[in-house]
Amino acid sequence: MYQIFVTKHDTAIQTSRFSVTGSITPVAPTGNIPVINTGNITAEHAVVSLYANLTAGTSSDGSFIVAMKVDTSPADPNCVISAGVNLSFAGTSYPIVGIVRFESASDQPTSIAGSQIEHYPIEMSVGSGGVCSARDCVTVDIHPRAFGNNVFVGVICSSAKWTSGRVLGTIATTQVIREYQVLQPLK
C-alpha cells in the first residue's frame, strides 16, 4: 500500500516527430530551446513553481526546458531521474512532456540546441483546459561525454500548437543516488 513502483526505464529517442494519438501534435524541437530557471539550477534536485508569460518568440518550436545540474560523483554512470509535472497552459496548447539530458560548458545555461538533447519519453495525462500532468522515472547516463562539460537533466514541454499565454504549475526533478527498499506492513 505504501510502495510505488517505477513504471519504465526508457532509452533516449532522437526522432523528428514523437508518436502520439489524438489531437496532440508534438514536434521535436530544432532551434535553440530556452532553459527556464528561477534562480540557480542546483545539483540533485529541483522544484520550480512556474508563473511565466511565454510567447511564441520565447520558445523554439513551442518548447522550453526546466533543468538541473546532475551530481556526477557516483561511480555508476547510470542514475535514476524522477520527475513530476503538473502544468496549466492558457489557450489550447497541449504539450508533450518528457525528460531530457544535455551537456553544457556553462554552469547556468540559458538555452540549448534541440539537436544536442536526448529525449526520454514519460507517461503523461492531459485534461481539459490545457492541463497536463506526468510522473515517471528514467535511467540516464550522468557522466559527461566531453571533458569539462556539465551534465543537466530536466523536463521539456513541447507543442506544435503553441499559443502565447501564461504557464502555471510545478515541475519537480530528483536524482536518485541511493535506492531504498520500502517495507510493506505485515498482514
Curated annotation (Swiss-Prot):
Q: Which GO terms describe its cellular component?
A: viral capsid
**What is the annotated quaternary arrangement, including any partners?**
The virion is composed of 60 copies each of the F, G, and J proteins, and 12 copies of the H protein. There are 12 spikes which are each composed of 5 G and one H proteins.
Subcellular location(s) of the protein: Virion
Q: Which Pfam families match?
A: Phage_G
Q: Which GO terms describe its biological process?
A: symbiont entry into host cell; symbiont-mediated perturbation of host process; virion attachment to host cell
Q: What further note is attached to this protein's record? A: Phi KhT, a host-range mutant of phi K, can grow on E.coli C and B, besides K12, and is more thermosensitive than the parental phage phi K.
**InterPro entries from the xrefs?**
Capsid/spike_ssDNA_virus, Spike_G, Viral_coat
Q: What's the protein called, per UniProt?
A: Major spike protein G
- UniProt main location, coarse: virion
- Which SUPFAM superfamilies does the record cross-reference, listed alphabetically? ssDNA viruses (SSF88645)
Can you tell me which family this protein belongs to?
Belongs to the microvirus G protein family.
The function of this protein is: Attaches the circulating virion to the bacterial lipopolysaccharides which serve as receptor for the virus. Determines the phage host-range. Probably triggers with protein H the injection of the phage DNA into the host cytoplasm upon conformational changes induced by the interaction with host lipopolysaccharides.
